[in-house]
């Protein structure tokens, strides 16, 4: 498979991670380098590993992955988005695992939800007998870079707005809408 095709696939797979990173940045107007690294690293890692898992699974689980992946993504994103919306109405400003999507279960849920498409791509690479090592690296690096940029972009928009609770609600709604989009595809 030519480099440009792998690059296009990598960018397409990273769009969910980018969009979710923007939503997270909207909810976290103060994003540390450590938080940026955690989110970018985990999104990139999951995006890189899922095609490998899909490739290894081959044809045996193809129909199950295609059937349930949209539902899994929807529930994970709806859960995190719903928590963000709920917490935007709370007056307590303490940062727990849901307010900081770069920690705990929120990070795991978001990482899995953004990378399920990559699992299906790995499955298709297996079916077409394409090698998987270079695409995994390219997909992971692209997701890492676009996640970091998306987080910065969301943070920049949030800083421009003095309505951080509204930004958090918008971020939660965006996550739920992405989940619905994945469900309805």
Curated annotation (Swiss-Prot):
Topological relation to the membrane, as annotated: Multi-pass membrane protein
Name of the protein described by the UniProt record: Putative manganese efflux pump MntP
HAMAP family reported in the protein's UniProt record: MntP_pump
Membrane-crossing residue ranges in chain numbering: 6-26, 41-61, 65-85, 107-127, 132-152, 164-184
Protein purpose: Probably functions as a manganese efflux pump.
UniProt GO MF annotations: manganese ion transmembrane transporter activity
Pfam families xref list: Mntp
Ranges in a coiled coil: none
Keyword Ion transport in record: yes
Disulfide bond entries: none
Compartments where found: Cell inner membrane
């Amino acid at each position: 498979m030519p480099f440009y095709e792998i690059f296009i696939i990598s960018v397409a797979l990273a769009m969910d991670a980018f969009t979710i990173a923007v939503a997270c940045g909207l909810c976290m107007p103060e994003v540390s380098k450590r938080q940026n690294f955690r989110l970018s690293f985990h999104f990139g890692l999951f995006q890189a590993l899922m095609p490998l898992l899909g490739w290894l699974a081959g044809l045996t689980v193809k129909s199950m992955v295609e059937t349930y992946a949209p539902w899994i993504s929807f529930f994970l994103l709806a859960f995190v988005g719903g928590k963000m919306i709920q917490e935007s109405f709370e007056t307590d400003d303490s940062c727990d695992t849901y307010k900081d999507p770069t920690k705990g279960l929120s990070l795991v849920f978001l990482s899995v939800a953004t990378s399920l498409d990559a699992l299906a791509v790995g499955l298709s690479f297996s079916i077409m007998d394409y090698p998987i090592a270079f695409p995994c690296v390219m997909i992971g690096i692209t997701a890492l870079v676009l996640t970091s940029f998306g987080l910065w972009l969301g943070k920049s928009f949030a800083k421009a707005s003095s309505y951080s609770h509204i930004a958090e609600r918008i971020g939660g709604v965006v996550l739920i809408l992405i989940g619905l989009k994945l469900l309805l595809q």
